Amino acid sequence: MPVTRVEVTPRQGDGMRDVRGDVVRRQLMADHGLSVATVRSICGYLISGETPSSAVASRVDDLFADPIIEHGLTNTMLVTTESFAATPDAVITVGFKPGVTDNPGKAATDGFLTLFPNDDDASIATYLTYVFYGLPQDCDVHWLAGTLHNDLIERALIADRAECEAKTWPELNFPTPPEQVFIEPQAVDLEVD
């Protein structure tokens, strides 16, 4: 099935805040003593379905973004746009592993099916991207990623300082679970001599 990517980020400007990014920045300082100048966030939605990307793009502000405080795009990674013109120090993308229940994705799927009821096999997976500015030089981005996700149920992709300079951004794909093979139960002789 084709996959459409939708990304949403808080607008920047007077009186506008990236609350998710601010929470991460403050928590890093409180828990680890790590001072970061700015953390910006991007909410991502991977839509696996037959609805054309153009139809999804026309409804982004209805389902995925609040157009007053957020900016959303379809099939474009926001980190490549003018909204993120300054080169960050690190970019970390976190999403659920295949087969793990994605509750925000399930809620998004319900809303999607309300708008596009004919695409009844559609499903949505979500992810969060954190864009770090003013990260200390000695900060290990793999350690940083470990503080942002639960390795048992989530996967993280990282762009370190060098990859950010080269504009090589982490891009998660739809988490398709592996096919489950049913094995016929077999009788076991439990008789002991």
Named regions from a protein language model:
Residues 1-193:
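Core nucleic-acid recognition elements
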